[in-house]
């Protein structure tokens, strides 16, 4: 095969790959699929991408290499036909509060440039545009007036300020000026009446009197320059023969006119300055619109748009609690009598008892406790059992006291404690727009840059397409190239189904799928060709409706002349690929081989391919024969949810069932389920400090005793955390080893078998198994510890064996092997078997938590929940649990979730995967669109009911799925 047309891989052995040889066609859309843990990512990311990136970086100078991440050389004999590689992974973009969708996609950078070049500043006082002018422009403006027009050229030296101004007038006389206009009247300087210093005055110096004619330019330029020097960049041309109507002058009662404005006048400014309010803007440059730059950032919030402030709702989390029982949350933990005695003294002054509930207190008493007595003195009696004393002073108030301590303390612990009672509120100075008033006064089409970032991408796209209609010829020419860049980028974000996001949205709040698609849009914007792109499940979090747009985008990337490799489980993606590689046959040690390759039809025809069987319909996730009965009485009811884009939504979730919350991306699913239901329920039932989104109430919580959100956040942030420690299997493993005869003879306790504490661990690497060596031009190298050879424990600890295996050998087993090895030890076996149940039999017992994907971390948490004793009164909430799962894994996961429901629990999932939705007992479909166009309940009921609803996109695709499976299996058979 010619190298040019193929990427040929020989002998790939990274992770679990079994010496894989593979030829992939270049410039095609290639999908790699297979069970979770079968080796897809090992081949796509750890072999192909790593080698492509490593070769590219290696070709750079040593100086350039130090700034780039250098990849380890993968375990492979040879790869030919590679291009420079770009990987677009699942990781959430950035936790930096300054990073927004606009900054990540670079759209905001182009917007800053656009506003700096064609934006017009408006005066906040008059609402009129303010422009900086050169002297030549001022002269041209005057010369353009009708010939013979009589004008006074004035320098406004005092504008609405108190004072006598004797000294200033004397100075002017010395400089040779003769006339001034004071408070609306012209005087010779010598004849100006004494000014009352208690009142505001206006003084304009008469620099020249002119009659407009063509040869006036030189004289006029000199006069205007004199004005600009005298009046700090301002000059006035006043029409001598055009007095204003009396009602429009200051004397006639007009509030926004100065006393000197008696005639029509033209105001010139060589700076961007509003001549009325004195509001000035220095030069208008792109940095003025950057909230990451002191020139543009709002000085109050430093460009963050929010401020941390004590939230009264967190101070009093439960209004039905009595004061003596800890209604005031920051005081509730203290065992000292001080706080109770403080409340008793306040009670005497404001007429309440400490046995009263917060809800029973008068508004005045509540204000006094929260915000202080505002100077009113209270007599406090204190007695702590050792001494008693009395003091009379105003009470500071719980909130001012916490704010003061937060500002003054040096203790990180104290700050953290107080921050538990703080919430983010929009900055009052910039209203959350992050910028200085100067930046927000610059507008295009009556909107400032902050208002545009608040629009959804769909609306912003329409706005930028229409805006050049309001430009003049010069502005249109300047803006053309900038607008092209902005429009293209917005179009790509639209194409990957992110039209509901706003440009101001914080990057840290995006899901993994959203941040990956944003990076994908940025890549298309860069328009590279001849590149190898490797993507990791870009369809995560996308509704079937938007999937077609995403696949178009991937094809567009291919058509530019790139090779696109996608690790994906989505049926449509597999069917649209030019080439499919199915890796398996199973996970972990049982995987790592290429089972089938070729066109989607070849995969379906291959009897060894599990993926092929699901695609052809030979195997499928079964629809339950009958759905669970829906109880009329036992149900949760969310009433009046209004968070984010929800439009006063009320919905029932039947208890003891499997419910799916569906809808297009941005429809309001997470706001409804996580931000409203989970946070409110965990606050009521578990006493958490979560702050739910706005809603009226939640009914039916009395049927629950626990609510658990099983999300995709990491199970631990250090390499020391692993599935065994997280699920609690490691404790019985250590106990078992400590109970062995050899360990007892040596007097070893369970702590001896921990790699986190001194005693049993290898001290050379402190139980890490590797030692980090910093290299400056190369990646940091982790060298296996030469004392313990990566085993983490010292020799004495490793001498203790069970069935010929040490504790280090156990940590190196896969979960499946571990469950078999400990088959006689139920405490260990049961915990490991739950991991096998959720499809994680392939991961190592001691695998570092940092190497688990989001979907794997979520399933480890699910396994931990499964291994707990069932109470049957728990509400489990899962956000897209099928992330990273093959059809076959989805079938297994559904068994687990339905098992939880069989125990009497309630499981609610946010899900786009139709295989999951069709097995649900109850479906709540939100939408119909994303962002502003969503937030309503479109359909609710059993899957069969959803299919009937014309407005439901989910229903349309579900109907198609239920109808097309039988058709396809007959085609595959042919």
UniProtKB/Swiss-Prot annotation:
Location, primary (coarse class): cytoplasm
Localization: Cytoplasm
Keyword Ribosomal protein: no
Description of how the protein assembles with itself and partners: Forms a heterotetramer with UvrB during the search for lesions.
PANTHER family: UVRABC SYSTEM PROTEIN A (PTHR43152:SF3)
Protein family (similarity comment): Belongs to the ABC transporter superfamily. UvrA family.
Stated name of the protein: UvrABC system protein A
The organism of origin for this protein: Brucella melitensis biotype 1 (strain ATCC 23456 / CCUG 17765 / NCTC 10094 / 16M)
Gene: uvrA
């Amino acid at each position: 095969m010619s190298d040019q047309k193929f990427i040929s891989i020989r002998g790939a052995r990274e992770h679990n790959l079994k010496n894989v040889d593979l030829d992939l066609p270049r410039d095609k859309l290639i999908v790699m699929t297979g069970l979770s843990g079968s080796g897809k990512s090992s081949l796509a990311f750890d072999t192909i991408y790593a080698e492509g990136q490593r070769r590219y970086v290696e070709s750079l100078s040593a100086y350039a290499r130090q700034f780039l991440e250098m990849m380890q050389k993968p375990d492979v004999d040879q790869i030919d036909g590679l291009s420079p590689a770009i990987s677009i992974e699942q990781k959430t973009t950035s936790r930096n509060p300054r990073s927004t969708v606009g900054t990540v996609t670079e759209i905001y950078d182009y917007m800053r440039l656009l506003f700096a070049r064609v934006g017009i500043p408006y005066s906040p006082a008059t609402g009129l545009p303010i422009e900086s002018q050169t002297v030549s422009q001022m002269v041209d403006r005057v010369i353009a007036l009708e010939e013979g027009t009589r004008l006074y050229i004035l320098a406004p030296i005092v504008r609405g300020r108190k004072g006598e101004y004797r000294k200033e007038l004397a100075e002017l006389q010395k400089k040779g000026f003769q006339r001034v206009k004071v408070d609306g009247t012209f005087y010779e300087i010598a004849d100006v009446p004494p000014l009352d210093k208690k009142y505001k005055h206006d003084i304009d110096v008469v620099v020249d009197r002119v009659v407009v004619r063509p040869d006036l330019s030189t004289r006029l330029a000199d006069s205007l320059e004199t004005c600009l020097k005298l009046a700090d960049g301002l000059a006035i041309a006043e029409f001598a023969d055009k007095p204003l109507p009396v009602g429009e002058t200051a004397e006639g009662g007009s509030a926004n006119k100065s006393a000197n404005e008696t005639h029509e006048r033209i105001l010139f400014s060589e700076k961007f300055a509003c001549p009325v309010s004195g509001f000035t803007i220095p030069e208008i440059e792109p940095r003025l619109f950057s909230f990451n730059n002191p020139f543009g950032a709002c000085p109050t919030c430093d460009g963050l748009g929010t401020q941390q402030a004590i939230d009264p709702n967190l101070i009093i989390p439960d209004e039905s609690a009595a004061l003596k029982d800890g209604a005031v949350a920051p005081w509730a933990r203290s065992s000292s009598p001080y706080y109770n005695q403080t409340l008793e003294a306040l009670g005497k002054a404001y007429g309440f008892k400490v046995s009263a509930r917060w809800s029973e207190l008068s508004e005045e008493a509540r204000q006094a406790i929260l915000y202080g007595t505002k100077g009113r003195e209270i007599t406090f009696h204190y007695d702590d059992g050792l001494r008693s004393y009395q003091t009379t002073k105003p009470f500071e108030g719980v909130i001012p006291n916490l704010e003061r301590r937060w500002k003054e303390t040096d203790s990180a612990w104290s700050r953290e404690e107080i921050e538990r009672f703080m919430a983010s509120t929009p900055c009052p100075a910039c209203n959350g727009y992050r910028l200085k008033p100067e930046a927000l006064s610059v507008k295009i089409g009556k909107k400032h840059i902050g208002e545009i970032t608040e629009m959804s991408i769909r609306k912003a796209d329409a706005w930028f397409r229409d805006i050049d209609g309001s430009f003049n010829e010069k502005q249109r020419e300047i803006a053309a190239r900038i607008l092209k860049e902005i429009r293209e980028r917005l179009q790509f974000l639209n194409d990957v189904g992110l039209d509901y996001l706003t440009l101001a949205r914080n990057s840290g709040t995006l899901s993994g799928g959203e941040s990956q698609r944003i990076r994908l849009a940025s890549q298309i914007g860069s328009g590279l060709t001849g590149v190898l792109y490797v993507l990791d499940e870009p369809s995560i979090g996308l509704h079937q409706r938007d999937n077609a747009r995403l696949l178009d985008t991937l094809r567009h990337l291919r058509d530019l002349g790139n090779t696109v490799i996608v690790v994906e489980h989505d049926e449509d993606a597999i069917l649209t690929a030019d080439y499919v590689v199915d890796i398996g046959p199973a996970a972990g040690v049982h995987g790592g081989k290429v089972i089938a390759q070729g066109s989607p039809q070849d995969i379906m025809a291959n009897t060894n391919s599990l993926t092929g069987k699901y695609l052809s319909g030979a195997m499928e996730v079964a629809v339950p024969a009958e759905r669970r009965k829906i109880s009329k009485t036992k149900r949760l009811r969310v009433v009046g949810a209004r968070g984010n884009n929800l439009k006063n939504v009320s919905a029932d979730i039947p208890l003891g069932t499997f419910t799916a919350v569906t809808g297009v991306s941005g429809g309001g699913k997470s706001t409804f389920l996580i931000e409203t239901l989970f946070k409110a329920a965990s606050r009521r039932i578990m006493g958490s400090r979560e702050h739910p989104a706005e809603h009226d109430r939640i009914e039916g919580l009395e049927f629950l005793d626990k609510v658990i959100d099983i999300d995709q956040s990491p199970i631990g942030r250090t390499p020391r955390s692993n599935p065994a420690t997280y699920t609690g299997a490691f404790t019985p493993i250590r106990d078992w080893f400590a109970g062995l005869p050899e360990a007892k003879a040596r007097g070893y306790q369970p702590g001896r078998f921990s790699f986190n504490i001194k005693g049993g661990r290898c001290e050379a690497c402190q139980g890490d198994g590797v030692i980090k060596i910093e290299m400056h031009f190369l990646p940091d190298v982790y060298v296996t510890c030469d004392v313990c050879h990566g085993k983490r424990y010292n020799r004495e600890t490793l001498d203790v064996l069970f069935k010929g295996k040490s504790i280090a050998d156990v940590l190196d087993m896969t979960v499946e092997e571990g469950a078999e090895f400990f088959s006689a030890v139920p405490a260990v076996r049961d915990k490991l078997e739950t991991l096998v149940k959720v499809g994680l039999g392939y991961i190592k017992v001691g695998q570092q938590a940092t190497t688990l994907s989001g979907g794997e971390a979520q399933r480890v948490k699910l396994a931990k929940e499964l291994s707990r004793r069932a109470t049957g009164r728990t509400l489990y909430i899962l956000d897209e649990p099928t992330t990273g799962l093959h059809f076959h894994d989805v079938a297994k996961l559904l068994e687990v979730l339905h098992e939880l429901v069989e125990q009497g629990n309630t499981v609610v999932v946010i899900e786009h995967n139709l295989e999951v939705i069709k097995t649900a007992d109850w479906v709540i479909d939100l939408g119909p669109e994303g962002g502003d166009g969503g937030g309503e309940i479109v359909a609710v009921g059993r899957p069969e009911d959803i299919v009937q609803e014309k407005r439901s996109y989910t229903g349309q695709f579900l109907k198609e799925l239920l109808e097309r499976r039988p058709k396809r299996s007959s085609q595959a058979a042919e």
